[in-house]
Amino acid sequence: MRLYDTIIDATMAEVEKHNVKKLPVELSRSWPDNGSAEFLMQRDSAFELGGGSNPSLHYTCVTTKRIMESDEILLVGPDLPEIKEEVPFARIVILQTEDLGDDSEEQHRAIREMEFVRYHVFPKGYMVRFSSMSSEEQVRISKEALHKGISFAAVGASYIRKYREAANVKHVRVIFLLQADAVTALKPYAGKVNDITKTLTHIFDNILADCGHCDMKRVCDEVDGMKEMHLGLAKKKDRKE
């Protein structure tokens, strides 16, 4: 699985330009889960991450390369108890998985399953608002959660715990960034991940290898492994017929 490897390398190169704090990973101390999405009124909120005119983004990358030995939570910028006002925000997840094999349909299914995890994490007092079209993500933090000691280590552990429930996931790296220059620099990679997602959907909805007339040809040409996945799926369809 090489689809996201170039983006992962570029992301980490950008992240490492900043002061990166490696937070402890203690799944037993993950933040309590609300069980479902909650709505926080403005009057009950301490502040927002990525709110107002502040930039925000999220994206998830998958790799079978051995890039970490254990789960990781990385932070660029202040931790939640240190924040007093609205700040920029990015949350990036990198998943190291088992070998997903050569079956393109199985690879696609596994990627989609892992992507959907982010819609099922509900830290109490941590209200997430997504925009899948623009890759934006804003978070509203409740005064009560802040009073009880919510932190990125606890929230990151909640995400890791949920991702580890997905089949094939070996290790999870969750990166939180709260510096405007860092968030802005990563926006192009969020766009590239979105392009890959749209291209995968297009491939599996239109299993034809007529690359010359495909709107997604640019992405297939640029992303290592995408064209092989598409052609492999087309051959599999031909064999069935």
What are these regions (language model features)?
Residues 187-232:
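Cysteine-cluster motifs in flexible loop/terminal segments that predominantly coordinate metals
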Residues 179-181, 237-241:
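Short Fe-S-cluster ligation motifs
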Residues 15-18, 167-170, 193:
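Short, flexible helical or helix-coil boundary motifs
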Residues 172-191:
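Long amphipathic alpha-helical scaffold segments
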Residues 1-22, 30, 34:
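Ordered core of a single globular domain
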Residues 27-31, 35, 105-111, 136-140, ...:
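Extended non-catalytic scaffold regions that mediate assembly and binding
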Residues 31-171:
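Long, charged N-terminal interaction/targeting segments
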